[in-house]
From Swiss-Prot:
GO terms for cellular component: ribonucleoprotein complex; ribosome. The N-terminal domain interacts with the head of the 30S subunit; the C-terminal domain interacts with the body and contacts protein S4. The interaction surface between S4 and S5 is involved in control of translational fidelity. The keyword S-adenosyl-L-methionine does not apply. Keywords: Ribonucleoprotein, Ribosomal protein, RNA-binding, rRNA-binding. Signal peptide: none annotated. This is Small ribosomal subunit protein uS5. Transmembrane segments: none annotated. GO terms for biological process: translation. PANTHER family: S5 DRBM DOMAIN-CONTAINING PROTEIN. One of its GO terms (molecular function) is rRNA binding. InterPro entries: Ribosomal_Su5_D2-typ_SF, Ribosomal_uS5, Ribosomal_uS5_C, Ribosomal_uS5_N, Ribsml_uS5_D2-typ_fold_subgr. With S4 and S12 plays an important role in translational accuracy. Located at the back of the 30S subunit body where it stabilizes the conformation of the head with respect to the body. Part of the 30S ribosomal subunit. Contacts proteins S4 and S8.
Amino acid sequence: MEKKLIKIHRVTKVVKGGRIFSYTATSIVGNRKKNIGLGRGKSREVLESIKKSYLKAKKNILKLNFSKNIIPYFLFAKHCATKVFLYPANDIIGLIASKYVKQVLNIIGVFSVFSKIHGSTNAINVVICTIKALSLIKK
């Protein structure tokens, strides 16, 4: 299984005695054979939150249904204020996508897609939206 860390976010809680920091890590797990998992972990330590996110991603693995390394037709998904459009492309074109869409597509083994994002480009929302779009493929 291949692991990718998407984002680490630091959250500060202000209390009477000072500040309390906690960290949220978001990661994806896949095997380049149409399997992908998304996980988020929270902790007061960075490494612990990363470890938790990988464990949750391994538990949430989703199998996608398509044959080759190319998506068969146009896909669209919406999550919160993010809209992701995925268009099939030739092998010559390769991946034309944002950083986070590329990470998701690489980890499932798709290497020729053109994508467009409308609305919010928040990393976590883009990843969730891309996985939603890919899960809409019918066998």
